[in-house]
Amino acid sequence: EEPDLVRLAEVLSLAAQVEQPLLRRARLAAVPAAGPELEGRFWFSPLAESAGVDHLLVDPRAADVLRDRLRERPADLAAAREVIRAAHEHADPAVVLFEQVVALSLEPDADAERVAEHLLRLATTMAEDRARAPDVARWVLRHVPRLPRAVPPRP
């Protein structure tokens, strides 16, 4: 296990997709002493799935484990959420809503109702523009499997 690579992956596990600017921002925030070669190691690691020219997706099984690890460290989780939020501030609304669902599911007081409300907003946002139907279908196929496994039960 490479601690720097895992730390970087934990941050990126909260993202709907990882573009180069987000990868760089996450590295600088999570592992500032590491050089840019860490970004390349992540891009071509088994943690990355569907790596393309301009972005990649984090493997969904790995993302669940990485998110669980991050949940155990609230300060690191908050910092990671801020990295993702800042990087995707002007991203497609579906990306932002997906990331909000992920973030909500990791809150200590997460409940299924709040997550369901965000999922409904996500579906509504994606369905509003019928011209984007093929893009929406592709997005759903790629991102629905990446939603968090489950919302933690309430104590």
Where are these regions (language model features)?
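Alpha-helix capping and helix-coil boundary motifs
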Residues: 1, 34-36, 109-115
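C-terminal boundary/linker of central alpha/beta nucleotide-binding cores
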Residues: 2, 6-15, 20-73
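Structural recognition of alpha-solenoid helical scaffolds
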Residues: 4, 62, 79, 114-118, ...
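Generic preference for hydrophobic/aromatic residues in regular secondary structure cores
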Residues: 47-48, 84-85, 138-144
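Amphipathic alpha-helical elements of HEAT/ARM-like alpha-solenoid repeat scaffolds that form extended
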Residues: 59, 95-104, 134-139
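Leucine-rich, amphipathic alpha-helical/linker segments
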Residues: 72-129
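Leucine-rich, hydrophobic repeat-scaffold detector
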Residues: 120-155
